[in-house]
Amino acid sequence: LLAGIPSDPSLYDPSANPHAAILRRRHVLDLMLKQGKITQRQYARADKAELPDPNDIRLPGTQGPAPYFVNYVKDDLVARYGAGRVFGGGLKVTTTIDMKLQLKARAAIESVLRNPDGPAAALVAIDPRDGAVKAMFGGRNFRRSQFNLAAQARRQPGSAFKPIVLATAMNEGISPVTELESKPVSIDAGDRIWKVTNYDHTYLGRVSLSRAIVSSDNSVYAQLTDIVGPKAIVKTAHSLGIRSHLSPYFSIGLGSGAVSTLDMARAYATIANDGRRVDGAVFENRARVVEKVERFRSSKVDVNSPLPRQVLDEGHAELLTDILEDVVRVGTGKRAAISGRQIAGKTGTTDNYGDAWFVGYTPELVVAVWVGYPDALKPMLTEFNGEPVAGGTLPAMIWKAFMERTDEDPSRSFDSPPYQGGASTWVVRREGTWQLDNGYCRGSRLVAYFSGEGPEDEADCKPNEVSVPLVVGMTRAGAEATLEAQPLEANVAYAPAKAGRIPGLVVGQDPRSGGLSAGDPVTIWVSKAEHGMLPNFVGSGIADVQREATRLKVRLVARTGPGRKGAVLRQDPKPGVAVGRGMRVTLLVGDGSRT
């Protein structure tokens, strides 16, 4: 059986394709019999043997309660020391896993998700104080699938990502007391208009950033994403410990970037640890799963001691924790609440109910829980007692079931955030940065900044300011009409049209963007064919075309094809473009034959 598999492991996989595996085994046995390697009796016995049951196969790492964690540790070790040293023996590895918590993680998940055909779950628990991974549940059955749902699966976190957006805003000096209008919004995302609504079409009016995160308001956090910018959010996410690739699209502010459960646990652990991300001295910016590595017959020990790095202001982290406590007290995470325990956290649900999250923490433990179908993005519309699965349902229930099984000290509490006063200021985006409104700016926002924070430069807005539209690429008439509608005055200048381009279009303008006072001039450059325009040669005789080409000083390249003899059938470039001296014009000329 084993000898037949390597030629095509997928085709001859005995668990996936047992019939093909049996036929392949028989082929190998035939060869062995012909070569005298086995007797007829041995052949018959081997041919009748049952295929092994995959559930009876003991894979390396499956003997304990944490097989997915063991595999994750192996990957880290191979990346650091190489496969030869890791699998060749001689290393003694001490890990961070807490077997009691690992067993409790499985028990908590099984107590909530009782249907084997229903959604699956992933869970990661981290001690925020030293970054140690204490539990990692990556799937129900390691023998059937070695794919680690906790570390390898990448799924959208939805609103569980909003604390990272708020942390980004705090990094830029923006206070959570800043109020934005909760309403349907349309945001210019550059190549498209991003339209955002709240999932239940309920809007709160003017609301603070802190209250909006408790209510999981998409509209407000889409606007906040526009203020701080997607690139800054990606930078913050990576600094907090998320290692998955994130693209800086505007939708990232609502959790569209795919991340792992381990990613989310690390990011929240950084917040819970007063803004300090804990790396390992040996494995650096990776989840800390190894305590130390000892070598056989060597005194050298690689101690992967905690290495804290301040990546978020301590006061900002404490303020963020204070806000996230309200999510559990009065917001979408109420099912995670435990009497007498201080808990902070955030729910997350994707638009199609394909992913549901709860990431929460106490002063001693951060736990991230994901619920969904592992093999497909299947909407969970009825899996919660006939209702959709949101982050505040099954994930929050698993989180609570796990935390109630732990031996945490309930008397420990979060540090109170320091007072961070500030003032609200009108600001406007100009030239890619936020500047102070000089009193004439349109589209400005009222933003509350921490003391000593916020923009210092004043915008150069004009009285009765209007926006300068981009008219490059329009016809002269279209550009003049667009500018007049603002109202702005068009000053027309001309520029030579490039050979092969259509003349009469706007090829430049000054200014290209920004604001001007109503009636101010905008200079536009319209392309002009200085050497004439290419005529329509199709249908003309080749002799006439050659004379015109000589006059225009263009170079003809002719080839023949079926059609009226001596007549031009097709030309490239098409007529109406600007002529350039020496420009190549390709013609198809009829040779008198029929198609």
Outline where the language-model segments fall:
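Glycine-rich, acidic and aromatic/proline-enriched surface loops and short helix-turn segments
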Residues: L1-D8, Y72-A79, I126-R140, M170-I174, ...
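Non-catalytic, structured segments within soluble enzyme domains
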Residues: L1-L103, F137, K235-S239, R243-S244, ...
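Second-shell loop/turn segments in exported
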Residues: P9-H19, V28-L29, L33, N55-Q63, ...
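Short, well-structured active-site flanking segments
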Residues: T39-A44, R144-F147, M170-A189, V228-A232, ...
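Conserved catalytic neighborhood of penicillin-recognizing serine enzymes
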Residues: I57-P65, I174-I233, Y249, Y268, ...
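A penicillin-recognizing enzyme superfamily signal
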Residues: T95-P116, L123-D127, M136, F142-F147, ...
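Short active-site loop at a secondary-structure junction
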Residues: P119-A120, R144-I164, P176-S182, S251
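Soluble, non-transmembrane domains of envelope/secretory-pathway proteins that act on or interact
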Residues: D188, R297-D302, I343-R555, R559-G561, ...
